Amino acid sequence: MGRNKKASFNYIKERVWKKLQGWKEKLLSHAGREILIKAVVQAIPTYTMSYFKLPLGLCSEIESLIRRFWWGQKGDRRKVHWVKWETLCLPKKEGGMGFKDLANFNDALLAKQAWRLLHNKDSLFYKVFKMKFFPNCSIWEAQESSTGSHAWNSILKGRDVLLKGARWRIGCGEDVIIWNDAWLPSLENPRVLSDIVPGFEDGRVSDLINPLT
């Protein structure tokens, strides 16, 4: 995949546009538009977003097409958008319509792929990616690469989503680094905030545990 990722994925926007163009002239209620947006339009990019991080600009352009369709805009005649798109993406119980925020949905799908790598270590999927992209560390420590595939770098975006909420559950503590890993039982900040002790940069939580107690 070349540097211009937006051009590589532009076919998704074109498919969405063609779908919406076919419906614009029809007299649809808001209930009808809601069903079409959720069941058809927002389903179009789902497969691709499961494996690749789409450019934010492309997501915004697709959402712009959907917004105009939702408010009944035809051609160049602009119509007032009475509610912000962010509000429409909220659950209905919170005053929204339950539409998908495409960028957030993309991140969630990629996080699912990262979760597969973490929990299916006997799979061919894991073995191939492990050997090629993180042979000497875990996926938690793996780094994005300018020479790596876009699929791999996309999975790392999903990994970063998991990192925001992931916590180590301490057993023996041999694999948990004191200073870098999230292991403290705190909801606000699970990482150690004090300065790193010189000479103990790679200290493990197991070093803090007295085996006799």
Please provide the spans of the model-predicted regions.
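A helix-boundary/hinge signal
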Residues: M1-T213
